[in-house]
Amino acid sequence: GPLIDGSLRVYKGKEPGFPELSIGVDEDTDSEAMVNALIDRGASFLKTYEMLSAKTFLGLLSIAKEKNLRVTGHIPLSIDLIEAIDAGLGGMQHIRNLDLACANNAEEILKQRQALLKNADSLPGSALRTKIHQLQRFVAIGNLDEERCIKVIRHLAANNVFQTPTLTINTLDSKRFYADQEWRDTYQFLPKTLQKNWYIGSIDMAKEEVSENDKIFEDWSM
């Protein structure tokens, strides 16, 4: 870290579950100075996040290229994946938002996202991101275009865009790893207050039914 996110950053330490992990940047930010400061602190790559504007993200890719830094992270919701690849994207995490790029109406839902990102309802960044995912993720998966997706994946491979799949995240709600006592035993390595919260939370969540969307997202991810 830190994550480099947009002005409506997700991890800003204000909402529960979203600690202070990010830097918020926009078109008015001196992005090169920010990148130089990260390099001075030992950064060897940049991790970008979903609420960056397309213009700011493309600017960061350009700066990173000049400084021989790879850029990885979540694909910003504001940009088409192919455009990001062509501009120098170096990696992706959790295959996040690949589903949006593989939909047969990818261009249409990109325009919808760009409109939503104007945030007419003044939502926090974390809530706005969740809203967009809820509106588009399963619509995109339902509109999967296999031929389009193969082209996108081949373009990722041809440009050496590495994947950090971390499929545990994508299947957490369907596979319910935390329902296993052996899994919960690993919480002993957490700070005491977190141990209790995680343990109670795991027990409670394990009682909930696996939703149809949980299974759909697992199948898509795997």
Set out the residue ranges of the language-model regions:
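Alpha-helix-loop-beta-strand connector modules within alpha/beta enzyme cores
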Residues: G1-V10, F57-H74
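Hydrophobic faces of well-ordered beta-strands that scaffold small-molecule active sites
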Residues: I4-L8, L46-T48, V71-G73, G91-H94, ...
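Active-site mouth loops of central-metabolism enzymes
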Residues: E15-D30, G142, D214-K215
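Active-site neighborhoods of metal-dependent hydrolases
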Residues: M34-F45, L52, L98-M222
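Glycine-enriched alpha-helix->loop->beta-strand junction motifs that scaffold or abut catalytic
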Residues: G42, I63-L69, D86-M92, N160
